[in-house]
């Protein structure tokens, strides 16, 4: 009888655990991801592929937390729970979030190419093609009229090439005013009419049509660059992409025989910006045996990448050198000063402070 009772209890616990695995929660769980050699992802035509060391791109594993994962996340080192609204835009689905992350990844690649080629003094051209619609907002004028992937090229006859251009044209409009939008959809040019609405003060208070926009552009370089990172999303690989591109463009091996990991958004001007999940990325790099880790420097109130990276490196007893940087130029300068030997320094190494513009704190697309 006792054995049967224990068997029934065990079966009930098993069923409860299985059910808990499928019960959703309003949280995402973040875990240390991978530290991937950037050489596997980047190819500069005719570039110098000889590297005695490696540049490593670090990632964070992000998944929707079930009830069971929620319970165990607190016990697993490196795991953290993030409320759904911290990652997703209002009304944004998980699929739309992944699409946004892919767009930010593309932007990071393009910025990395531009910044690296400009630093090396090599030819690079940027062609601005218009404003792509990532998605339409529920209950707004664009819903059911515009579609994800549409490319807006004019508004009331004004050429539109970038998101700031679209915003400037809209600033001269009034709530309720009807506007004519010229766009491309699957190879066909279309004209649509929409009425403008005013966003709430918390959303900027401007008038708009209810889309999440991104500037669409094409980059042309000589030599050509191919980046294949379809399985990775987000904007934070910009710095490491640029370092690898630069390493292949020039004859000097910037790796210095070291495993060099890092993270950071990168503007086309070469400015490094803040990112998310830095603790998990430091742990992923340490697990891969990296010698040093480039991290966005903390400059403005609210910046925390440098502080968190240094703290987690101490906490896990990492021998990696944490190197905060403000720009691609500063990161390259740091590497050029290194000798070709294993890093032998403590966790923290702060280069000279350089001025730079405000970094991108969080990759969240504004609505128009």
Residue ranges and their predicted role:
Residues 142-165, 281-282, 289-298:
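Conserved PDZ fold ligand-binding element
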């Amino acid at each position: 009888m006792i054995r049967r009772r224990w068997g029934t209890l065990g079966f009930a616990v098993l069923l409860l655990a299985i059910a808990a695995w499928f019960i959703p929660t309003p949280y995402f769980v973040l875990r240390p991801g991978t530290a991937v050699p950037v050489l596997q992802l980047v190819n500069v035509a005719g570039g110098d592929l000889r590297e005695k060391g490696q540049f490593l791109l670090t990632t964070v594993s992000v998944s929707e937390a079930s009830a069971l994962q929620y319970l165990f996340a607190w016990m697993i080192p490196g795991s953290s729970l993030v409320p759904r609204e911290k990652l997703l835009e209002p009304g944004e689905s998980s699929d739309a979030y992944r699409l946004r992350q892919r767009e930010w990844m593309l932007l990071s690649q393009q910025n990395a190419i531009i910044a690296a080629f400009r630093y090396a003094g090599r030819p690079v051209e940027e062609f601005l093609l218009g404003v792509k619609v990532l998605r339409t907002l529920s209950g707004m004028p664009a819903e059911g009229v515009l579609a994800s992937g549409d490319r807006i090229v004019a508004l009331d006859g004004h050429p539109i090439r970038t998101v700031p251009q679209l915003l400037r044209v809209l600033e001269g409009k009034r709530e309720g005013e009807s506007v004519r939008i010229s766009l491309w959809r699957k190879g066909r040019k279309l004209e649509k009419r929409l009425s403008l609405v005013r966003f709430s003060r918390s959303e900027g208070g401007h008038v708009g049509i209810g889309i999440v926009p991104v500037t669409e552009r094409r980059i042309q370089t000589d030599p050509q660059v191919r980046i294949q990172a379809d399985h990775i999303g987000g904007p934070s690989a910009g710095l490491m992409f640029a370092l690898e591109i630069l390493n292949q463009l020039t004859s000097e091996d910037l790796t210095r025989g070291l495993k060099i990991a890092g993270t950071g958004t990168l503007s086309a001007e070469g400015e490094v910006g803040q990112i998310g999940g830095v603790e998990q990325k430091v742990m992923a790099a340490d697990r891969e045996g990296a010698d040093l880790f480039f991290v966005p420097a903390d400059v403005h109130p609210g910046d925390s990448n440098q502080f968190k990276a240094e703290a987690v490196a101490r906490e896990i007893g990492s021998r990696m050198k944490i190197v905060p940087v403000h720009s691609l130029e500063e990161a390259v300068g740091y590497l050029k000063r290194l000798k070709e030997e294993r890093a032998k320094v403590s966790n923290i190494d702060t280069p000279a402070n350089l001025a730079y513009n405000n970094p991108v704190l969080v990759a969240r697309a504004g609505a128009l």
